[in-house]
Curated annotation (Swiss-Prot):
Its EC number is 6.1.1.19. Gene3D superfamilies: Arginyl tRNA synthetase N-terminal domain, HUPs, Isoleucyl-tRNA Synthetase, Domain 1. Belongs to the class-I aminoacyl-tRNA synthetase family. HAMAP family: Arg_tRNA_synth. It is an enzyme of class 6 (ligase). The gene is argS. Keywords: Aminoacyl-tRNA synthetase, ATP-binding, Cytoplasm, Ligase, Nucleotide-binding, Protein biosynthesis. It is found in: Cytoplasm. This is Arginine--tRNA ligase.
Length: 552
């Protein structure tokens, strides 16, 4: 019996109890909450349902809890239901009912934890979207991990997810990038507003190797050549780096196409005509302050040129034309103002601003031996995705970035994340999976196939804890999707790994027969428990884009 099964049973029982006493079952919530108590002595699960609905039903919370306890006590799979405090209900499950979740896990396999709650919802998930003027820095790296994990989690709930990278190949930063390449190719100092780092020289060398005449071309032609070739080479590097990191996109959208196609002008004229832009001081403005921005924003400047937000508005209109029900933007810590701007754009086009969600990620810092690591060997200024992967590897990098809420800044201790110790979270979780795989390999030497597992014998404290933790997984994935918080999956995996390590460390809980002893129904039941644990660990790691090693 999973927590969801118990919640359904509890609601059905409560509806019957209320109806039998002439009380209205309509006061019951659509979803009943059951939680695992912090103190195991309080049962396997607890609920405050009686306290939540008693007043609406016209009765006393303890009385209602007592009626529920009496009815639940007679239900299949329930060992006991006891009233506590002002109306809490503590519930214990029979071992066989509790163990049934293991069979569900093995039957579902990689599908355990998936759901259809977002079936039919078309989501555009835009993340990373780093400028093609240099390697991806740590902020973009965080989104490469978190965004990819969120896409996997939303898809696991049935959503149709389009992962999109907005390629900022239009604007002054591209001109500065081109000027930096020209300077490197012609032996000139880096411009004051240019980009430095070994990668600039490397790209310039590649361009000159392909176009030997490039340094001596007329200035305008030279600038355009280095601009076009440089952007193409830099973005090829970015795509390759992301792919090696395990993050790929369905759509790479070029900002420049919005201007070249006239989409920006068309979007602005549409909003002018609808009255959703207003004119002041010779410029055209959008009322983004009504949606959380600190001030309204200029869309068309007084000189007639488009402000940066004009491209954002046209880009949203493009997404809208592709039929997305929800657009999620994952932006850096310095982009808080974009929340109001993007929601204002949605409202201006007649959409519910709630169809736009903006997630803001805080800063990431690297630490080694207690000291901040601030310089990249290739970028020259900031630490990059390549630097992080070189230092700790892909799995550790992805996990380190995804296990924290994006609302908090992160310090990644390079010594910790390269250690093979339980204090290293990714090692702790992956080692748990490797241990389950090892038992599976060793079990192949015994005749488990002819023995029927008796899940009712899984009564040890460590076994019960592990089973209940396994049963929580679907709820964790669902909450990670609805709250847009992939770190919930990572923290859950650490909890599951801990429960498994405690189970296997107890030498009395043998999975494999001792010596020449035959496989017993209890041995077989414990192997089911191990295999179910292995499956859930693998499923959760897959959602995070982290490998599940068979041995370590």
């Amino acid at each position: 019996m999973t927590p969801a099964d118990l919640a359904d049973l509890l609601r059905a029982t409560a509806a019957k109890v209320l109806a039998e006493r002439g009380l209205d079952p309509a006061v019951l919530p659509d979803e009943v909450t059951v939680e695992r108590p912090r103190n195991p002595e309080h049962g396997d699960y607890a609920t405050n349902l009686a306290m939540k609905v008693a007043k609406k039903a016209g009765t006393n919370p303890r009385d209602l809890a007592g009626w529920l306890a009496e009815a639940l006590g007679a239900a299949d799979g329930i060992t006991s239901a006891e009233v506590a405090g002002p109306g809490f209900l503590n519930i214990r499950l029979a071992a066989a009912a509790q163990g049934a979740v293991l069979e569900q896990v093995l039957a579902a396999g990689s599908g355990y934890g998936t759901a259809d709650t977002l079936r039919g919802t078309k989501i555009n998930l835009e993340f990373v979207s780093a400028n093609p003027t240099g390697p991806i820095h740590l902020g973009g790296t965080r989104w490469a991990s978190v965004g990819d994990a969120l896409g996997r989690i939303l898809a696991a709930q049935g959503a149709d997810v389009t992962r999109e990278y907005y390629f900022n190949d239009h604007g002054a930063q591209i001109d500065r990038f081109a000027n930096s390449l020209v300077a490197a190719a012609t032996g000139q100092p880096t411009p004051d507003d240019g980009y430095a780092g070994a990668y600039i020289g490397e790209i310039a060398e590649q361009i000159v190797a392909e176009h030997p005449e490039a340094p001596t071309l007329p200035a305008d032609q030279r600038h355009e050549l280095f601009r076009a070739e440089g952007v193409e080479l830099m973005f090829a590097h970015i795509k390759r780096t992301l792919h090696e990191f395990g993050t790929d996109f369905d759509v790479y959208f070029n900002e420049s196409t919005l201007f070249a196609s006239g989409a920006v002008e068309q979007a602005v004229e549409t909003l002018k005509a609808s009255g959703d832009l207003y004119e002041k001081d010779g410029a055209w403005w959008i009322a983004s302050s009504e949606y959380g921005d600190d001030q309204d924003r200029v869309v068309i400047k007084s000189d007639g040129n488009a402000a940066y937000i004009a491209g954002d508005i046209a880009y949203f209109q493009n997404k809208r034309s592709r039929g997305f029900d929800l657009c999620i933007y994952m932006l850096g810590a310095d982009h808080h103002g974009y929340i109001g701007r993007l929601k204002a754009a949605a409202a201006a086009f007649g959409d519910d601003p709630a169809t736009v969600e903006v997630l803001i990620g805080q800063m990431v810092n690297l630490v080694r031996d207690g000291q901040a690591v601030k310089m990249s060997k290739r970028a020259g200024t900031v630490v990059t995705l390549d630097d992080l992967v070189e230092a700790i590897g892909v799995d550790a990098a992805r996990y380190a970035l995804v296990r924290w809420s994006v609302n908090s800044s992160v310090d990644i201790d390079l010594n910790l994340w390269t250690s093979q110790k339980n204090e290293n979270p990714v090692y702790y979780v992956q080692y748990a999976h490797a241990r389950t795989a090892s038992i599976g390999r060793n079990a192949a030497a015994f005749d488990y196939a002819s023995v029927t597992p008796d899940l009712s014998q899984l009564t040890a404290e460590e076994e019960g804890e592990l089973i209940r933790t396994i049963g929580e997984y679907p709820r964790v994935v669902a909450s990670a999707a609805s709250l847009r918080e992939p770190h919930r999956v990572a923290r859950y995996l650490e909890e599951l790994a801990g429960a498994y390590h405690r189970f296997q460390t107890n030498s009395k809980l043998r999975v494999l027969p001792l010596g020449d002893d035959p496989v017993s129904p209890l041995n077989a039941a414990r192997l089911v428990l191990v295999n179910a644990t292995r499956q859930v660990l693998a499923n959760g790691l897959a959602l995070l884009g982290v490998s599940a090693p068979e041995q370590m």
